[in-house]
C-alpha cells in the first residue's frame, strides 16, 4: 500500500511540465514526468499530455517514460504550427493588385490578377449568363464589372486567344449570329457591341431557344430569332442589313447557309466569320482538306476569305475563317 501510494503521488506534479502546456507552443518545456511518473516503480504511469498518445505501455516505472518525451515533441510541433500561420498572415497582408487592360480588339479586355483572363464589360452588372465568374475593378473611382470569357465554351473567344487578326465586331456593330444556341457567346457579343449595337441571334432548337430568349430579356441589344438559318426569307422582316455575320451552325452545308444569309442581310464590304467543324462536314477526309474545300465554296459565293485560324488547343479539328463580302458589280444592260 505504501509503495503504490508513493508511485501515484510522486508524479502528480509533473503534469504541468510536459503535457498540456506544450500544445500551446511548448510552454511546459517537455520536462515533466507525466501524470504518474517518478514513483518507486510500483504503479503504472499516467498520461503525459497530448503527446503521449503515440507511445506504448510499459512495465514498472512506465509513468516517467510515457509522460516525459511526448509532451516535449508535441510542444515543438505547436511552435511549427505557429510559424505556418504567421507566414499565411504575411501573405494576406500583401493585397494583390488587379487591373483590366484593353485588348487590341475593341470592346474586349484582359483581366490581370491571380490568373489572367479574357473578359468583356458586363452590360447587365450583377448578372451572370452561364455561371461565368464576374470580377469588379475600380477605375478612376468608378467600379466596373467584367465577365470572364471561357475559350473552351466559345469559338469566338478561342479565335481571339489564338491570335486572329480581326473579328470585325466592335461597339455599335450590327451582327447576325447564326447558331446562337443558348446564348453563351451571344452574351459576350452583346457586351462588346454595347447598347448602341444589335445582335440578331438565330437558333432553330426550341430548347436552346428558350434559354436564348431568357438571356435576351435582360439584354436589350439581343433580338432572338427562332428559325432555321437555311431559310433566311422566313425572318427577313425581322432583320435589317448587318455589318458582320458570325456562323457556328456545325452543318454539312454551312457554307451555303452563310452564303444565303450574306446575300440577304450582309452589306457590301461587310465581313463574315465562320466556325468550321471538320467532322461535321466530312468525317472521312483530313481536317485540312475539309477546310480547303469550304474556303473554295465560300469563294464561289463572292465571300472572299482573308484569314484562316485553327482553334487548338481549345477545340479539336476546328477552324475559323474570316473574310469580306464583295458581290460582283452588276453589268449595265444596253
UniProtKB/Swiss-Prot annotation:
Provide the GO MF annotations for this entry: histone H2AQ104 methyltransferase activity; RNA 2'-O-methyltransferase activity; RNA binding; rRNA methyltransferase activity
GO cellular component term, pick one: fibrillar center
Cell location? Nucleus, Nucleolus
Q: Does the keyword S-adenosyl-L-methionine apply?
A: yes
Q: Which family does it belong to?
A: Belongs to the methyltransferase superfamily. Fibrillarin family.
HAMAP family membership: RNA_methyltransf_FlpA (MF_00351)
This protein's name: RNA 2'-O-methyltransferase FBLL1
Amino acid at each position: 500500500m505504501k509503495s503504490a501510494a508513493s508511485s501515484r503521488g510522486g508524479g502528480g506534479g509533473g503534469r504541468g511540465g510536459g503535457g498540456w502546456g506544450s500544445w500551446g507552443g511548448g510552454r511546459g518545456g517537455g520536462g515533466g514526468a507525466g501524470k504518474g511518473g517518478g514513483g518507486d516503480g510500483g504503479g503504472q504511469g499516467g498520461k503525459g499530455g497530448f503527446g503521449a498518445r503515440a507511445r506504448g505501455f510499459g512495465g514498472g516505472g512506465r509513468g516517467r517514460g510515457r509522460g516525459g518525451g511526448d509532451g516535449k515533441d508535441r510542444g515543438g510541433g505547436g511552435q511549427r504550427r505557429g510559424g505556418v500561420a504567421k507566414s499565411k498572415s504575411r501573405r494576406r497582408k500583401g493585397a494583390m493588385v488587379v487591373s483590366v487592360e484593353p485588348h487590341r480588339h475593341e470592346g474586349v479586355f484582359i483581366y490581370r490578377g491571380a490568373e489572367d483572363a479574357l473578359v468583356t464589360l458586363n452590360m447587365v452588372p450583377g448578372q451572370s449568363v452561364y455561371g461565368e465568374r464576374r470580377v469588379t475593378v475600380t477605375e478612376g473611382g468608378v467600379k466596373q464589372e467584367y465577365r470572364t470569357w471561357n475559350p473552351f465554351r466559345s469559338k469566338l473567344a478561342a479565335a481571339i486567344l489564338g491570335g486572329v487578326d480581326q473579328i470585325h465586331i466592335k461597339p455599335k456593330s450590327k451582327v447576325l449570329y447564326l447558331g446562337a444556341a443558348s446564348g453563351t457567346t451571344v452574351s459576350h457579343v452583346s457586351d462588346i457591341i454595347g447598347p448602341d449595337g444589335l445582335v440578331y441571334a438565330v437558333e432553330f432548337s426550341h430548347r436552346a431557344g428558350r434559354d436564348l430568349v431568357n438571356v435576351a430579356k435582360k439584354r436589350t441589344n439581343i433580338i432572338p430569332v427562332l428559325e432555321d438559318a437555311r431559310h433566311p426569307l422566313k425572318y427577313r422582316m425581322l432583320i435589317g442589313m448587318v455589318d458582320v455575320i458570325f456562323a457556328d451552325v456545325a452543318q454539312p452545308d454551312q457554307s451555303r447557309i452563310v452564303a444565303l444569309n450574306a446575300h440577304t442581310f450582309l452589306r457590301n464590304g461587310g465581313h463574315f466569320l465562320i466556325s468550321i467543324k471538320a467532322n461535321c462536314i466530312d468525317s472521312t477526309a483530313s481536317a485540312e482538306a475539309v477546310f480547303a474545300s469550304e474556303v473554295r465554296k465560300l469563294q464561289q459565293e463572292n465571300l472572299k476569305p482573308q484569314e484562316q485560324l485553327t482553334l487548338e488547343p481549345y477545340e479539336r479539328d476546328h477552324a475559323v475563317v474570316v473574310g469580306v463580302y464583295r458581290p460582283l458589280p452588276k453589268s449595265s444592260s444596253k
